[in-house]
C-alpha cells in the first residue's frame, strides 16, 4: 500500500502525467496540450535503487514502486496538485507484431465518420489479438496483450487514402500493425502503478511514443529507421511511404557497454555507469576507485578501446534487426534516441554495419520536437525523447486501454482489444469456469435376480 501522502488539490482534467520507467532511470513529466502544442510544466529524473530492472523487465517491484513514488512526489511539489492518473510505455521486450487488414461494404450515400473508422481499427486489433492467441508457440505461457497499434493504410474502393473521414464509396478498409507483449511484462507495470496508488489511463509502446516525436508524419514518406537504445533493450520502428511498416526489438543495449567497463576496470556497476556517462560527456580523463580501493585515472581513449568490441556487437545486432524489418534493404537514414544511443562510437558502427554514410545515422535530441514548449529544467539529450513521446501520444490518443469488470465484488482489469467471454473474465479473477458446469451424480450399477441393472446419476445442481 502507498504511504500516506500530503493532501493536495485535484489533478486538472487537461493535465497529462507521464512516467517512463526505464531499466536504469525513471523519468516523469507533467504537461498540458494547447492546440497542436504541448507545454511541459514539470520534469524529474531519478535512478532506481540498485538494479530493480533488468533488460526492460521489472524484477524488484518494491524498489520500482519506491522510485515511482519519489518521482511523483517531486513532480507534485513542482505543480502543486495531486498526480493520480498516468500514461506509461512498455519496452519491446519479447515483442510480437501482427499486421491485419479489415474491409467493410458501405451503404450507398453514407458518409464515413470517425465512429466507423474507429470500429474498423478496433476490429483489426481484435483480429490481430486472435491471430496471436491462436499462433503455435513453443515454451510460451500466458496471454499476450496489445500495447499499441499503428494504422499502415486506409483504403477506399481499393485505393490507398491518408484519411477516410468525410468520404463516400462502396468499400472502406484499414490495415493495422498491432504490437503485443506478454502478460507478465504488462501486469508488472500495472502492479507497480497500483501499489503506488496511481491509475493508468494510457499504455503505449516505447518505440511508438518515440516515433511520434522523432519522426513526425511529414517525414514518414521516407524509408527511415528509429532505434530507441535504452539500458536494457533497443526498440526499433521503420517508416516508409507515409506510414509505419514494422516494429522490432533487440535484446541488447547500453547495459552491455556498462558491464564491459565494470569487468575490464574492476569496478561496480554504478561506477561503470558513471564512467560511461563521463565518456559520453566528452571528458578526456576519468577518475574512479576500483574494487581493490585503488585510485585510478584513465584516458578516455582507453575506455573507448575497451568498449569497442561490445559497441560493434551491439551495432551489428541492431543493424541485422533493421535490415530484417526493412525487407533486407538499407533505409535512407537511421535516427537514434534513448540514453544508450550516446555510447561512444555506436552511431558510426551502425552506419558501417548497414552500409550507410556516417552522416545518415544521427542521434536525435529534444530539439527535434518543434511543438513542445519547456517550462523549467528538463534533460535535453536523446534520453528525453521517449517521455516526451508518451506525452504526445497521450494527447493524440486519449483514453484507456483497459476496462474493469466486477466479479463477486472483485475488480478485474480486462484489455479492451480482446473479445472477452464471461469465462475469460472469471479466469482472470482466479475463478475456475469449470465450477459453473453442474456435474451429474455417479451412476449405480447392481444385479437384480441375476440381471445387471444401471440407475443413472441425478442431475447436477448449481
Predicted stretch roles:
Residues 1-25, 29-224, 243-245, 269, ...:
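Nucleotide/phosphate-binding catalytic cleft detector across ATP-hydrolyzing
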Residues 31, 89-91, 206, 229, ...:
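Generic beta-strand/beta-sheet core signal
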Residues 55, 259-262, 370-374:
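Short, charged, surface-exposed secondary-structure boundary motifs
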Residues 114, 118, 351-385:
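Conserved phosphate-binding/catalytic loops in two-lobed NTP-binding clefts
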Residues 201-206, 250-251, 380-382:
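Active-site nucleophile and cofactor-binding loops and adjacent substrate-binding regions
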Residues 215-280:
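Acidic, glycine-rich loop-and-beta core segments that form the ion-binding/anion-interacting portion
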Residues 311-319:
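A general structural motif
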Residues 382-398:
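Short, structured interface segments
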Amino acid at each position: 500500500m502507498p504511504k500516506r501522502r500530503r493532501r493536495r488539490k485535484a489533478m486538472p482534467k487537461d493535465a497529462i502525467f507521464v512516467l517512463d520507467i526505464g531499466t536504469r532511470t525513471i523519468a516523469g513529466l507533467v504537461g498540458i496540450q494547447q492546440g497542436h502544442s504541448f507545454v511541459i510544466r514539470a520534469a524529474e529524473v531519478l535512478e532506481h535503487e540498485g538494479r530493480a530492472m533488468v533488460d526492460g523487465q521489472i524484477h524488484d517491484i518494491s524498489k520500482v514502486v519506491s522510485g515511482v513514488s519519489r518521482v511523483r512526489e517531486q513532480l507534485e511539489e513542482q505543480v502543486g496538485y495531486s498526480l493520480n492518473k498516468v500514461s506509461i510505455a512498455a519496452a519491446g521486450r519479447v515483442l510480437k507484431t501482427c499486421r491485419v487488414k479489415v474491409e467493410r461494404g458501405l451503404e450507398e450515400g453514407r458518409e464515413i465518420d470517425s465512429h466507423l473508422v474507429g470500429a474498423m481499427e478496433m476490429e483489426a486489433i481484435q483480429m490481430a489479438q486472435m491471430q496471436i492467441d491462436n499462433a503455435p508457440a513453443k515454451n510460451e505461457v500466458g496471454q499476450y496483450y496489445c500495447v499499441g497499434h499503428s494504422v499502415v493504410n486506409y483504403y477506399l474502393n481499393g485505393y490507398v487514402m491518408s484519411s477516410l473521414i468525410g468520404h463516400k464509396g462502396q468499400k472502406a478498409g484499414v490495415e493495422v500493425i498491432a504490437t503485443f507483449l506478454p502478460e507478465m511484462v504488462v501486469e508488472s507495470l500495472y502492479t507497480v502503478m497500483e501499489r503506488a496508488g496511481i491509475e493508468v489511463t494510457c499504455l503505449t509502446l516505447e518505440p511508438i511514443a518515440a516515433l511520434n516525436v522523432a519522426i513526425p508524419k511529414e517525414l514518414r514518406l521516407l524509408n527511415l529507421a528509429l532505434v530507441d537504445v535504452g539500458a536494457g533493450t533497443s526498440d526499433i520502428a521503420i517508416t516508409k511511404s507515409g506510414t509505419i511498416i514494422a516494429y522490432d526489438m533487440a535484446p541488447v543495449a547500453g547495459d552491455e557497454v556498462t558491464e564491459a567497463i565494470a569487468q575490464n576496470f574492476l569496478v561496480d556497476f554504478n561506477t561503470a555507469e558513471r564512467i560511461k556517462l563521463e565518456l559520453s560527456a566528452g571528458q578526456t580523463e576519468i577518475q574512479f576507485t576500483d574494487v581493490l580501493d585503488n585510485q585510478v585515472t584513465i584516458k578516455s581513449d582507453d575506455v573507448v578501446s575497451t568498449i569497442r568490441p561490445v559497441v560493434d556487437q551491439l551495432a551489428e545486432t541492431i543493424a541485422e534487426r533493421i535490415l530484417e524489418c526493412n525487407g533486407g534493404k538499407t533505409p535512407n537514414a537511421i535516427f537514434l534516441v534513448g540514453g544508450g544511443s550516446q555510447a561512444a562510437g555506436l552511431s558510426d558502427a551502425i552506419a558501417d554495419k548497414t552500409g550507410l554514410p556516417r552522416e545518415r545515422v544521427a542521434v536525435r535530441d529534444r530539439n527535434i520536437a518543434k511543438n513542445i514548449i519547456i517550462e523549467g529544467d528538463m534533460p535535453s539529450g536523446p534520453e528525453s525523447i521517449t517521455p516526451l513521446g508518451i506525452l504526445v501520444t497521450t494527447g493524440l490518443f486519449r483514453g484507456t486501454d483497459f476496462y474493469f469488470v466486477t466479479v463477486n465484488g472483485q475488480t478485474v482489469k480486462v484489455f479492451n482489444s480482446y473479445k472477452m467471454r464471461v469465462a475469460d473474465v472469471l479466469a482472470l479473477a482466479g475463478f475456475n469456469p469449470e465450477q459453473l458446469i453442474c456435474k451429474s451424480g455417479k451412476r449405480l450399477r447392481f444385479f437384480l435376480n441375476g440381471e445387471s441393472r444401471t440407475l443413472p446419476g441425478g442431475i447436477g445442481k448449481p
